[in-house]
Amino acid sequence: MAGRRDHKRVLIYSHDSFGLGHLRRCRAIAHSLVDTDSSLSVLILSGSPIIGSFDFRSRVDFVRIPGVIKLRNGEYVSLSLHIDIEETLAMRSSIIRHTADIFDPDILIVDKEPLGLRGEVRSTLDLLRARGTPMVLGLRDVMDDPGALETEWERKNAVPALSDYYNEIWVYGLPQICDPLAGIELPASVRRRMVYTGYLRRNVPAAVAAPEVPEMRDGEFLLVTAGGGGDGDELFDWVLAAYERDGGSLPTALLVFGPFMLKLSFTLLPFT
């Protein structure tokens, strides 16, 4: 069991239903942990389809679970498999629990969702709680509008999960910046578990191959990017509409689409 090992293990569940932010944050945390402790290994659970494109340091690895994507109407569907979302979630939940059972972490860090996507982590939380494994919920410093978050967490029964499972709640930021749970009525016992971690310094690689960039008119241009790009088609559509209306007075635009932009969305944009 974990208490009899010389090398410690951390398991991170990465909320991955959309975009790059969750994966990048979990990766940064994992790298910081192994840099701090040479006896530590970190395993990340993620459904991101591009997790294999990232570089991971020694003693950091990942398990890729079947991916899902959130539609505009709020519903989730399987990212690649042509199967029902409930089947996909059942597969994900089983893989997550089995990985936790075998990896037997010294600590579990859950990203954003106290019970995971649609409760898929609950059985894993029950397993590790029975073993006495410390469990942490990690939250970014700015979450959502307080009213919207309160409604969402009430629907997901998230607050009882904080009391039942988590030893600490890590807020990745400073209390002077934001309290992400300001709109949630939390028991005092849960409030006392909140720990503000501060921020990790982002290191830019010393040498990165520069992408090929088209020559810009007069050296000035407008850079338009939507992060991962999964929900960026409306932004790009508005930008292109502005250029169609009065493009002569605007600088040249460079659009960076991101890896999650759907091919169909790309082909429907009104390029001229």
Task: Go through each PLM region and give its residues.
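Conserved nucleotide-sugar donor-binding subdomain of glycosyltransferases
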Residues: 78-118
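Nucleotide-activated donor-dependent transferases that construct or modify glycoconjugates
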Residues: 2-19
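Short internal beta-strands
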Residues: 42-47, 137-138, 169-173, 251-258
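Donor-nucleotide binding loops and adjacent catalytic segments primarily
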Residues: 30, 184-186, 199-272
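An aromatic- and histidine-rich active-site surface loop
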Residues: 50-52, 108-127
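Conserved nucleotide-sugar phosphate-binding/catalytic loop shared by glycosyltransferases and other
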Residues: 7, 14, 32-87, 91-93
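A short, glycine/small-residue-rich beta-strand->loop->alpha-helix junction that serves as a flexible
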Residues: 14-27, 51, 232-234
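Active-site-proximal region of nucleotide-activated glycan assembly enzymes
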Residues: 125-196
